[in-house]
């Protein structure tokens, strides 16, 4: 990292990409990481804000969760959904891809006993499976790029507000210089990200305006 403040405070910068919820939980629960892009509920579940001082420095926007189909708008009705093939995320901590749809299905009296649930490793894989005809309905967010291959007319809202991804920094002291330097780093990452969702970043207050 070329930021002089970060170079001064850290001997080296190492990037770790978690491959599963297990990785994420382990890194947060044991205080392994200094900077993390995760959901707020994971930090709260392990008390990492109190134990390790994980502090939110920036956040991407909240979003909505949907049941998305290829040729018709799904109906939130047990009789309609019975026999359908569902695509969900194989990440129990994912709200739009796992928690929200599982909650809705449970409320409707649906489970793996009366519907076919297939699990996939990413939202990209969910879309591939839907387009390939492997499943009838997926649960996910709606991205701008989805307009190219899917129709929002065939997206049924499940939950209007799902907490977005957030950046947390380990701060066991009030290190304002580091707080502001890390904000600039994540802003640079956001500005250069290819996906529109990640280009939108809300910075926590406490620093001079970032240019």
Segments the model singles out, each with a brief description of its role:
Residues 37-77:
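A glycine-rich, hydrophobic loop/mini-helix early in the fold
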Residues 40-42, 70-73, 86, 91, ...:
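Solvent-exposed coil/turn segments that connect beta secondary-structure elements
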Residues 1-44:
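Extracytoplasmic small-molecule ligand-binding "clamshell" domains
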Residues 20, 24, 36, 97, ...:
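Stable alpha-helical elements in mature extracytoplasmic
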Residues 28-29, 81, 129-131:
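Hydrophobic residues within well-ordered alpha-helices
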Residues 37-49, 128-162:
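A ligand-binding cleft/hinge motif common to bilobed small-molecule-binding domains
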Residues 1-7, 64-122, 127, 204-209:
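Bilobed "Venus flytrap"/periplasmic-binding protein-like clamshell domains
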Residues 59-69, 148-192, 196-211:
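Periplasmic-binding protein-like
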